[in-house]
């Protein structure tokens, strides 16, 4: 059950139902950085939407009554096995995107960033993540322009409309 707006108020709703009906719902997105590089992940083929597509470091929906910050840390650990990196809340944004098979993400997203040490090692959960890559934001944007079909709709939105939010005005 994830927090979604129904009749103007937040209520717990099954995740698949939220996406089938395109309900506005809470979400969290994390961007881990190492200097000029951001960690991106290729979603596992078993994911029920956007399988095999590249996305930001991790993203998810908070559980009912879970804080956004706790959710971000939980999902870093569940998807990538990463713990102990302090995260900075950047802002909350809203977007709506079709993600295939009649499913819709209409998210109110808390954006978090973190600085990963050069010594960071991690083991992705193969049920969630097929591959990872450290890439410069400029190179990521260029590759997304060359092969947009390889990237999730929300990553396109983040890079098109919210880079300053993600980077905190650092670049």
Question: Which stretches of residues belong to each language-model region?
Answer:
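Short, solvent-exposed loop/turn elements at beta->coil junctions and helix N-caps
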Residues: 16-20, 93-98
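A glycine-rich, hydrophobic loop/mini-helix early in the fold
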Residues: 27-61
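Acidic, metal-coordinating catalytic segment for phosphate/diphosphate chemistry
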Residues: 1-29
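Nudix hydrolase/Nudix homology domain
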Residues: 14, 52, 93-94, 103-171
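A short local loop/turn or secondary-structure capping micro-motif enriched for an aromatic residue
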Residues: 19-22, 47-51, 131-132
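The catalytic Nudix box helix
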Residues: 40, 57-90
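A structural signal for short, well-ordered beta-strand segments
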Residues: 30, 58, 89, 110-112
């Amino acid at each position: 059950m994830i927090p979604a707006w129904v009749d103007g108020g937040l209520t717990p709703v099954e995740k698949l139902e939220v996406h089938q009906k395109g309900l506005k719902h809470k979400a969290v997105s994390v961007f881990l950085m190492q200097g000029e590089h951001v960690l991106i992940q290729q979603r596992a083929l078993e994911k029920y939407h956007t399988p095999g597509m590249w996305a930001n470091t991790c993203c998810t929906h908070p559980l009912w009554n879970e804080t956004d910050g706790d959710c971000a840390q939980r999902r870093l650990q569940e998807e990538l096995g990463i713990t102990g990196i302090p995260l900075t809340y950047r802002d909350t944004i809203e977007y709506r995107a079709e993600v295939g098979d009649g499913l819709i993400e209409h998210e109110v997203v808390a954006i978090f960033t973190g600085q990963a040490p050069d010594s960071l090692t991690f083991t992705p959960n193969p049920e969630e993540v097929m591959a990872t890559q450290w890439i410069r934001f400029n190179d990521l944007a260029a590759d997304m322009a060359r092969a947009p079909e390889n990237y999730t709709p929300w990553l396109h939105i983040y890079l098109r409309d919210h880079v300053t939010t993600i980077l905190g005005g650092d670049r």
